Every structure is written in C-alpha cells, then in structure tokens.
C-alpha cells in the first residue's frame, strides 16, 4: 500500500466507484490495525495513521460529491 501515499483527489475521482469502495475498505482495515498498534504502544510509522485518515476522508468526500451531483440531476 505504499503507492497510496500519492492518492490525490484527482486520482481518486478517476477511479471507478467500486475501486474506491474496495480501497476504502482496505484503508479502514489498515486504520484499525494501526490504531490497535498505537494502543499497545508500538507503531512503526505513526504518521501513517494521519495519512490513512486523510485518504479515507478524501474518498468519502468524493463519494458525497458524486451523490449530490446525481441528486441534483434528478430534480
């Protein structure tokens, strides 16, 4: 998952919704693992927690934007 460092909004928008959801699930699982490590007092890359949270937020934001566009086009 090292390539996720460069996941900018532009790249995420170009992904298919299914790909984004799959990535979102993977990132959430990684975040749980990292949070567990942090609770135990050992995290290899503490900055990765922040990075993963931000990528998750980007994905959720993009999904919400697309949802609002669809709703707007229907009305």
Swiss-Prot record:
The keyword Transcription regulation does not apply. GO terms for molecular function: structural constituent of ribosome. SUPFAM superfamilies: Ribosomal protein L29 (L29p). Signal peptide: none annotated. Keywords: Ribonucleoprotein, Ribosomal protein. GO terms for cellular component: cytosolic large ribosomal subunit. GO terms for biological process: translation. InterPro entries: Ribosomal_protein_uL29, Ribosomal_uL29, Ribosomal_uL29_sf. The keyword Ribonucleoprotein applies. Gene3D superfamilies: 1.10.287.310. Belongs to the universal ribosomal protein uL29 family. This is Large ribosomal subunit protein uL29. It comes from Pyrobaculum aerophilum (strain ATCC 51768 / DSM 7523 / JCM 9630 / CIP 104966 / NBRC 100827 / IM2).
């Amino acid at each position: 998952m090292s390539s996720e460092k460069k996941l900018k909004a532009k790249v995420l928008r170009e992904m298919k919704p299914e790909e984004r959801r799959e990535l979102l699930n993977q990132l959430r699982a990684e975040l749980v693992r990292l949070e567990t490590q942090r609770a135990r007092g050992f995290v290899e890359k503490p900055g990765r927690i922040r990075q993963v949270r931000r990528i998750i937020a980007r994905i959720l934001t993009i999904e919400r934007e697309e949802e609002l566009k669809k709703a707007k086009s229907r009305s």
